[in-house]
């Protein structure tokens, strides 16, 4: 049976559960796919040229994580779906010798929320994940605000119709979303007292990091604010990516079931 290589490109990467859940799917569906897929964690140096690395490694598809999602958008031969709007790519697929970029973070995040009737969101951070979330939340009709320590990237969110801040706004929000990398460094993304104020009035504290109780989520727990880590988002976006890797042979709902069973 033909072997195809896939992977997740990032820095850092050792924390990623993507190889676990994708390899479970490749094993489960290999007969239907007609090939054996193997999915690797790939640590890229920060200065890497993503397309060159992808082709050099002989990959058929890959996920892209911190800090390469915006750079991945720039190197694709073709961009499809909501990735066109959000300027960030987390899924790369080789299709007819062209490198095609997708974004499954956006819908993956929304599916992970459930239908709770949220009206407003504060996104902390302005990177590729934040862009995808803002696009999807605006599409779903929420009022979206973005808080970042610098002006870097905020022009994108302004064009999208978000309220943008470099100092914490004195408002209440249903969703407070940590889309920064602070949790990977075991840090809070924002001043503790400011976060407490948001959590006390918010409906859900959401951290895109997963696999451990981050300082952000620990504070929410302390204040008895409902909280959620990025595990469900990971599985939803991964199952949507797997559908792309399988050329739509495996619907994301089937991939989701397998991934959920192993993580």
Swiss-Prot record:
Record text on subunit structure and interactions: Homodimer.
The gene coding this protein: aroE
Name this protein carries in UniProt: Shikimate dehydrogenase (NADP(+))
Superkingdom of this protein's organism: Bacteria
Annotated binding of shikimate, by residue: 16-18, 65, 90, 105, 210
GO cellular component assignments: cytosol
Catalytic reaction annotation: shikimate + NADP(+) = 3-dehydroshikimate + NADPH + H(+)
EC number assigned by the record: 1.1.1.25
